[in-house]
């Protein structure tokens, strides 16, 4: 049931995307067709001109048309015949030249124009009609890009380029329309502004150009929207594929999280999770094994080498004295790691061995040795040993040691040998 619902949702989403692409394609070619019709037809403007009149009540018409004599004070000026014009030609609807079309002359010979003036530049742009033509070309290219995007669906940049072309075509179209209106409003003539407004109107070619502008902007927005949706879908699909690949690799014994780590958004989260999980999996530090005794601070579990510390040789006499003192009691320990002496005369031998170590270890106080095994679960083992003590004459054996003296001496010698295992951090 869930799979059917998901299939219906995907189908509805695909239909919606297909409708958007279809509307964009149809709108692109419709806008191109409207702009082409507007450029090629001569119904942008309806006005009256003297070139189409049959009679001219004034004497000496500038356009060379016939005039009716009289020359009295009751002479009236003929407004001229009705004409329709486009970007290139003007055609007569009335008068003697009815149905005749002539090319528009934007620069009459009897008019002197300053080449640096704004009016001259406006007439040049109006005569060339470069902006409407550029708009039509951009619309055609945009329509081709939309059609190509339906074939090459994996290349999302094509539909983005089409949207940019449509927006640029709309801007070029509206600039051309503004230039055309400005050129007509600035047309020189003897009429006042009120009379000019009553003697010209815009035709259906002009409105076709305006409709082409609206369509170009709408389909430009649609094309950009399609590009955004496709990019979002591709991004989500890539994320889901990586997550599936990571889950499959993790289930089969591979490195599952490695695929997820390729995603920038999951990189930091995974590091934080791995750190927290490693901290939670570490054993709690043992209080008994802590260097500071119960309640002392713990240290992280790591691979640290064993360090052997050698003591100052000047302190070897203390160990020798302790060893000699324990000779009579039997069992006094040697200096800094010497084995415990045997009962009776074994203490003297232990003292001699300690003296030999004191003589050989006079090189310094601390000596670093990199000889220790690395264990995954172990901590740091620190062994403190003393150098061999110089030979000393054996002291006379005491007759009767006081109660508790031997135990105190043994405890003092035991403190010179440290073999501690630090707790993991």
Swiss-Prot record:
Residues 272-304, 343-365, 377-425 are annotated as: Disordered. Residues 277-287 have a biased composition (Low complexity). Residues 412-425 have a biased composition (Polar residues). The modification Phosphoserine is found at residues 252, 255. Pfam families: PMP22_Claudin. GO terms for molecular function: calcium channel regulator activity; channel regulator activity; ionotropic glutamate receptor binding; protein phosphatase 2B binding; voltage-gated calcium channel activity. The keyword S-adenosyl-L-methionine does not apply. Palmitoylated. Probably palmitoylated by ZDHHC3 and ZDHHC7. Detected in heart left ventricle. It is found in: Cell membrane; Postsynaptic density membrane. Residues 343-354 have a biased composition (Gly residues). Keywords: Calcium, Calcium channel, Calcium transport, Cell membrane, Ion channel, Ion transport, Lipoprotein, Membrane, Palmitate, Phosphoprotein, Postsynaptic cell membrane, Synapse, Transmembrane, Transmembrane helix, Transport, Voltage-gated channel. GO terms for biological process: calcium ion transport; positive regulation of synaptic transmission, glutamatergic; postsynaptic neurotransmitter receptor diffusion trapping; regulation of AMPA receptor activity; transmission of nerve impulse. GO terms for cellular component: AMPA glutamate receptor complex; dendrite membrane; endocytic vesicle membrane; glutamatergic synapse; L-type voltage-gated calcium channel complex; plasma membrane; postsynaptic density; postsynaptic density membrane. The chain crosses the membrane at residues 19-39, 129-149, 158-178, 208-228, 318-338. Residues 387-401 have a biased composition (Pro residues). Interacts with CACNA1C. Identified in a complex with the L-type calcium channel subunits CACNA1C, CACNA2D1 and either CACNB1 or CACNB2. Acts as an auxiliary subunit for AMPA-selective glutamate receptors (AMPARs). Found in a complex with GRIA1, GRIA2, GRIA3, GRIA4, CNIH2, CNIH3, CACNG2, CACNG3, CACNG4, CACNG5 and CACNG7. Interacts with CNIH2. Found in a complex with GRIA1, GRIA2, GRIA3, GRIA4, DLG4 and CNIH2. PANTHER family: VOLTAGE-DEPENDENT CALCIUM CHANNEL GAMMA SUBUNIT (PTHR12107), VOLTAGE-DEPENDENT CALCIUM CHANNEL GAMMA-8 SUBUNIT (PTHR12107:SF2). Regulates the activity of L-type calcium channels that contain CACNA1C as pore-forming subunit. Regulates the trafficking and gating properties of AMPA-selective glutamate receptors (AMPARs). Promotes their targeting to the cell membrane and synapses and modulates their gating properties by slowing their rates of activation, deactivation and desensitization and by mediating their resensitization. Does not show subunit-specific AMPA receptor regulation and regulates all AMPAR subunits. Belongs to the PMP-22/EMP/MP20 family. CACNG subfamily. This is Voltage-dependent calcium channel gamma-8 subunit. It comes from Homo sapiens. The lineage of its organism: Eukaryota, Metazoa, Chordata, Craniata, Vertebrata. The gene is CACNG8.
């Amino acid at each position: 049931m869930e799979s059917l619902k998901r299939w219906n949702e995907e189908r509805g989403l695909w239909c919606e995307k297909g409708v958007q692409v279809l509307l964009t394609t149809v709108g692109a070619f419709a806008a191109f067709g409207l702009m082409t019709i507007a450029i090629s037809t001569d119904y942008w403007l309806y006005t009256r001109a003297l070139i189409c009149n049959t009679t001219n009540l004034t004497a000496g018409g500038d356009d060379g048309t016939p005039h009716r004599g009289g020359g009295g004070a009751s002479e009236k000026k003929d407004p001229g015949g009705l004409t329709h014009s486009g970007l290139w030609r003007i055609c007569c609807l009335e008068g003697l030249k009815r149905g005749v079309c002539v090319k528009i002359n934007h620069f009459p010979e009897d008019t002197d124009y300053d080449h640096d003036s704004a009016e001259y530049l406006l007439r040049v742009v109006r005569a060339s009609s470069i902006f409407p033509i550029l708009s039509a070309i951009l619309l055609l290219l945009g329509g081709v890009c939309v059609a190509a995007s339906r074939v090459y669906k994996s290349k999302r940049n094509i539909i983005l380029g089409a949207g940019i072309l449509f927006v640029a075509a709309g801007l070029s179209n509206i600039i051309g329309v503004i230039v055309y209106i400005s050129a007509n409003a600035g047309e020189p003539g003897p009429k006042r502004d009120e009379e000019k407004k009553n003697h010209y109107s815009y035709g259906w070619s002009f409105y076709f150009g305006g409709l082409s502008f609206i369509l170009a902007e709408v389909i430009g927005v649609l094309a950009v929207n399609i590009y955004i949706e496709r990019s979002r879908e591709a991004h989500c699909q890539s994320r889901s594929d990586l997550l599936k690949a990571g889950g499959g690799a993790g289930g089969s014994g591979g490195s599952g999280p490695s695929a997820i780590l390729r995603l920038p958004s999951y990189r930091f989260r995974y590091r934080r999770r791995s750190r927290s999980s490693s901290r939670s999996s570490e054993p709690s530090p043992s209080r008994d094994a802590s260097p500071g005794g119960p309640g002392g601070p713990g240290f992280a579990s790591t691979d640290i080498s064993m360090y052997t510390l050698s003591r100052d040789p000047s302190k070897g006499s203390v160990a020798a004295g302790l060893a000699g003192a324990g000779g009579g009691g039997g069992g006094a320990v040697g200096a800094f790691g010497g084995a415990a002496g045997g009962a009776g005369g074994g203490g003297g031998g232990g003292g001699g061995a300690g003296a030999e170590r004191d003589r050989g270890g006079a090189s310094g106080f601390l000596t670093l040795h990199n000889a220790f095994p690395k264990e995954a679960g172990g901590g740091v083992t620190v062994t403190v040993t003393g150098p061999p003590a110089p030979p000393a004459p054996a002291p006379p054996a005491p007759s009767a040691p006081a109660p508790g003296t031997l135990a105190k001496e043994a405890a003092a010698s035991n403190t010179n040998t440290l073999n501690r295992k630090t707790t993991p951090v």
